[in-house]
Regions:
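Helix-biased detector of long, well-ordered alpha-helical tracts
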Residues: 2-195
Length: 195
């Protein structure tokens, strides 16, 4: 799997700016409806975005693998150095990567989004375009989450996956094959260069 985003060019989905409204004008439910329109919904999703909680049906006989990562503006991404679609892409793939590292197939995502009140809606359109692009690329479904206002933009993604056999960090045995998808330490080195 390639965990890097193919392009920093805004996708047509993220370019949808039908109306220019503020977050306060849209309200929480209006924002959720706007951002999740056209979201992928695959097998196993009984109830997804729009209700109090998601209802999922895992594949019988598989183990459920769960992880969460939080990306915070100024720490994990910067508005001046990368496109908002890249932030959404990264939020999905770092979680899918953790699930895959455990020998599981990523299936579902839940997103908790904190947004400063003065954030242009267009920025969130782009963030969700990146989330949508990554979700389709890795066949995972965004099934729920929460939106709140706060001092800095942050994306907390919880990914759920399924595995027949779980692979843990301490579970490697002589003769096992170890694989990496890119240069070790490259992400940290890149961030250090940008700072």
């Amino acid at each position: 799997m390639a965990w890097t985003r193919r392009s920093s060019t805004p996708s047509p989905e993220g370019a949808r700016i039908a109306e220019r409204g503020s977050l306060s004008e849209l309200g929480e439910f209006g924002l959720i409806a706007r951002l999740t329109a056209g979201a992928r919904v695959g097998p196993g999703v009984e109830v997804g975005v729009g209700d109090d909680a998601a209802v999922l049906t895992p594949t019988p006989g598989r183990k459920l693998v769960v992880t969460t990562d939080v990306l915070v503006e100024g720490r994990h991404f910067s508005a001046g150095l990368s496109a908002p679609a890249d932030w959404g892409w990264k939020a999905v793939v770092v979680n899918c990567s953790d699930v895959a590292a455990m020998g599981a197939l990523p299936r579902w995502l839940v997103l908790a989004l904190t947004v400063p009140a003065d954030t242009p809606v267009e920025v969130l359109d782009q963030v969700y375009a990146g989330i949508g692009e990554a979700s389709r690329a890795f066949a995972v479904d965004l099934v729920g989450g929460d939106v709140s206002d706060g001092p800095a933009l942050s994306l907390a993604v919880t990914a759920l996956g399924e595995a027949e056999r779980v692979v843990t960090r301490g579970g490697a045995r002589p003769g096992d094959h170890l694989a990496v998808s890119g240069p070790l330490g490259a992400a940290a080195a890149g961030l250090a260069l940008l700072r």
